[in-house]
């Protein structure tokens, strides 16, 4: 599998190196980094080129890196059924710079982009219906951002006496605790970001 990905990375560098800002083959996974203006041409090439054939969009997700100037990564996971290969394409952006929508290439991108906007606040230009998909209508903020409080801002519950859903400020029943535990499960052999202290 990694041999096929190595060949694919080499081919992409030769055929469309101008669209790829960086390429990384690590842990048996190929990740391409692109800029916002090169995203749609790169995704189009990956879908339409006979040596690629990435016709399936598996997922779009966001990653929040608050310490970076371009704090968000929008990550596209693609599958080539004919080649039996998966690839990842990343685009970095900030709170104010929108990313071009991939709905014209992959109709399934619609709800994935809505989810990424809902959870992280990343805007997508050209999206046909960019609105919340998982949070409530009046929800404020984006809950997967690292600066969003883990307790949230409001509590939503059904009030049996009033026979309706009510919104109230969050009231913690006990003193807030912050635990810094090591992960109890046996994970990968390589060190993931944030696990550096585990080796000490």
UniProtKB/Swiss-Prot annotation:
One of its GO terms (molecular function) is NADH:ubiquinone reductase (non-electrogenic) activity. It is found in: Cell inner membrane. It comes from the Bacteria. GO terms for cellular component: plasma membrane. Its EC number is 7.1.1.-. It catalyses: a quinone + NADH + 5 H(+)(in) = a quinol + NAD(+) + 4 H(+)(out). SUPFAM superfamilies: Nqo5-like (SSF143243). Keywords: Cell inner membrane, Cell membrane, Membrane, NAD, Quinone, Translocase, Transport, Ubiquinone. The keyword Translocase applies. NDH-1 shuttles electrons from NADH, via FMN and iron-sulfur (Fe-S) centers, to quinones in the respiratory chain. The immediate electron acceptor for the enzyme in this species is believed to be ubiquinone. Couples the redox reaction to proton translocation (for every two electrons transferred, four hydrogen ions are translocated across the cytoplasmic membrane), and thus conserves the redox energy in a proton gradient. NCBIfam families: NuoC_fam, PRK06074.1-5. Belongs to the complex I 30 kDa subunit family. HAMAP family: NDH1_NuoC (MF_01357). This is NADH-quinone oxidoreductase subunit C 1. The gene is nuoC1.
């Amino acid at each position: 599998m990694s041999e096929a990905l190595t060949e694919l990375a080499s081919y992409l560098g030769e055929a469309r190196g101008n669209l790829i800002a960086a390429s990384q083959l690590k842990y048996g996974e190929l990740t391409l980094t692109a800029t916002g203006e090169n995203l749609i041409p790169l995704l189009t090439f990956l879908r339409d080129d006979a040596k690629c054939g990435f016709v399936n969009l598996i997922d779009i997700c966001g990653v929040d890196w608050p310490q970076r100037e371009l704090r968000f990564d929008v990550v596209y996971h693609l599958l080539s059924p004919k080649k039996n290969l998966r690839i990842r394409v990343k685009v970095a952006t900030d709170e104010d710079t929108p990313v071009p929508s991939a709905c014209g290439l992959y109709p399934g991108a619609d709800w994935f982009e809505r989810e990424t906007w809902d959870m992280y606040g990343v805007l997508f230009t050209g999206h046909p219906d960019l609105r919340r998909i998982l949070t409530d209508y009046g929800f404020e903020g984006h809950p997967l951002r690292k600066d969003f409080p883990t307790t949230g801002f409001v509590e939503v519950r059904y009030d049996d006496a009033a026979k309706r859903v009510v919104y109230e400020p969050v009231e913690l029943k006990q003193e807030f605790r912050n635990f810094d535990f090591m992960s109890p499960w046996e994970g990968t052999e390589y060190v993931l970001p944030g696990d550096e202290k585990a080796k000490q």
